[in-house]
UniProtKB/Swiss-Prot annotation:
Subunit structure of this chain's protein: Part of the 50S ribosomal subunit. Forms a bridge to the 30S subunit in the 70S ribosome.
Cellular compartments per GO CC: large ribosomal subunit
Protein name: Large ribosomal subunit protein uL2
UniProt region (Disordered), positions on chain: 221-287
TM ranges: none
Listed InterPro entries: NA-bd_OB-fold, Rib_uL2_dom2, Ribosomal_uL2, Ribosomal_uL2_bac/org-type, Ribosomal_uL2_C, Ribosomal_uL2_CS, Ribosomal_uL2_dom3, Ribosomal_uL2_RNA-bd_dom
Keywords of the record: Ribonucleoprotein, Ribosomal protein, RNA-binding, rRNA-binding
Entry keyword rRNA-binding: yes
Biased amino acid composition, Basic residues: 271-287
Amino acid sequence: MAIRKFRPYTPGTRTRVVTDFSEVTGRKPEKTLVVSKHRKKGRNNRGVITCRHRGGGHKRLYRLVDFRRNKHGVTAKVAAIHYDPHRNARLALLFYSDGEKRYILAPAGVQVGQTVVSGPEVPIENGNAMPLSSVPLGSSVHCVELYAGRGGQMVRTAGASAQVMAKEGDYVALKLPSTEVRLVRRECYATLGEVGNSEVRNTSLGKAGRRRWLGRRPQVRGSVMNPCDHPHGGGEGRAPIGRSGPVTPWGKPALGLKTRKRNKPSNQYVLRKRRKTSKRSRGGRDS
C-alpha cells in the first residue's frame, strides 16, 4: 500500500494526498455482512446535539465486523480485502472451512489466500488470534479484549499495535499506542500483528468538500460567535477572549484539563500513564 499525491490542477488537488487502495481487492461488500444503520448526526434520543460538527455525508452500509474471533480451531481463508467507510482500517473477508463468512480487521501484511485461525494453541503468525497468555514477549498485537469474551475493544485503528511487555500471575502488561502500560487479564484474546493501512496518517483531504463527504460539518471559532453562544464571543472587531486561557463552549478549561477520575477503579491496572502531549501537538484551535 502506498499514498498518491496530485498535481495542483485545482486548489482542491494542490494538497490532496490519498491512499492508492492497491490492497483492496473486493469491489462490493458481502451482502450477508452488511446492515443499514440510522445515522444519529450527533443527536441523542431527544434530538439534542450532544456531539457537535456531525451530520450529512455519503450514505453508508455498516459492515458487521467480528471482534470476538470465537470460532476456535476452525481455519479460515482470506477471500478478499475490502474498504470500510466507517473506519480507516481495511477489512479482511474470511471464508471458514465450515462455510461461514466473517469480516475481521485486516492485519498488515495479510494477503488474499492466506489462512488464519483463532484458539489457545495456534501458530504464531500474523492474523491469528489467541489469548494473551500464549503471545510471546515483545510481540505486537491488536484488537485486544479488555474483558474475556466481550470482543476486541483496544488498538483497532489503522496502523495501531500494542506490545506485550511482561507476564505475571493472571495479568499481562501491554504497552499501548499512547505509551500507557496497562495490565490485561491473560485469558483475553488479541490478534497478532498490527492493523493495516498505516499510511493513512500521511493523507490529506485537500478541500472542505471531502470533509463534508465524511459527515463532518464545519467548526466555527468561538471568538467569532456571540456572547450567548460561546465564552469567547462578543466584543468589537477582533477582540481577545478576555480570560487567562481558552475555554470550551461550556466554560471548562480547553487545554490540558485532566478528565479521568482520580479514584477510577481501573487505575490499579495502569502501571504507567500515557505520555503528555504538548500544546503544539494538540493544536491551538479556538474551540
